[in-house]
């Protein structure tokens, strides 16, 4: 599935990510940015985090539908709590 981003803000963020990066999307909501980056081969892996369970459940559904569950992790957290133990070193968005 070829995924497109809904909006210029997400497109602008995606343009800044270098190929092969490991990205964390803080406040991911639907996980559109991680799905786009990993699905297009821009990022090698990603973490999609959110403080609320509802958005994270939507993100999980979207990630599964995109077939990227093995390369995009989910994290229920406030901000960056618990993130750095996952090895994300390239980009926090």
Question: Where do the model's predicted regions map?
Answer:
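A short SAM/SAH-binding and catalytic strip from SAM-dependent methyltransferases
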Residues: 88-93
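Glycine-rich SAM-binding Motif I of class I
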Residues: 31, 35
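Conserved S-adenosyl-L-methionine
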Residues: 39-45
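Conserved SAM/SAH-binding beta-strand->alpha-helix loop
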Residues: 52-53
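Conserved alpha-helix/loop element of class I SAM-dependent methyltransferases that forms part
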Residues: 4-20
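S-adenosyl-L-methionine
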Residues: 60-86
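The conserved SAM/SAH-binding core of class I Rossmann-like methyltransferase domains
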Residues: 49
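Conserved class I S-adenosyl-L-methionine
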Residues: 20-29
